Amino acid sequence: MIKKFKKIVIKIGSNSIVDPKLKTIKSKWLEKLCKDIALIHKTTKIVVVCSGAIALGSKSISRSALRKLEDKQAAASIGQIELAYQWRTKLKKYKIKVSQILLTLEDSETRRRFLNARNTISSLQNRNIIPIINENDTVATEEIKYGDNDKLAARVAQMIGADLLILL
């Protein structure tokens, strides 16, 4: 049934991909998801919006320190590289290349930046590369944050003209 869609955005929440106690990737869960993505990717353009950078990075920063914005941003910078590595490693098994795109609210509200982001995603998809998108939490301040990646995923779906948005 999903194969009838031409463009799909899959949004993955922190609790789906990161073990909340261990602050590590749920590796087996991600492997199963990547297998499904590989099957769908044969006939459908896919974009993944993935949360979890702060949750992953918080393992390296004391929990009490995560009260300040700059500490959450530091955790995001630590966790984001792990997220990208996991996606790259898991999808490489299926000969699928991935890219990383980090967006802020301004990237979808400023016309020039919106078009640039859309064109970048389109260019990647035309090369059968799956963009893995997250909010750029290392630079986003409270005033310019999406708030959560559900909103970011909806905006990306609208940006690329997706036929389906899946929230996990």
Set out the residue ranges of the language-model regions:
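Nucleotide/pyrophosphate-binding catalytic subdomain
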Residues: 1-168
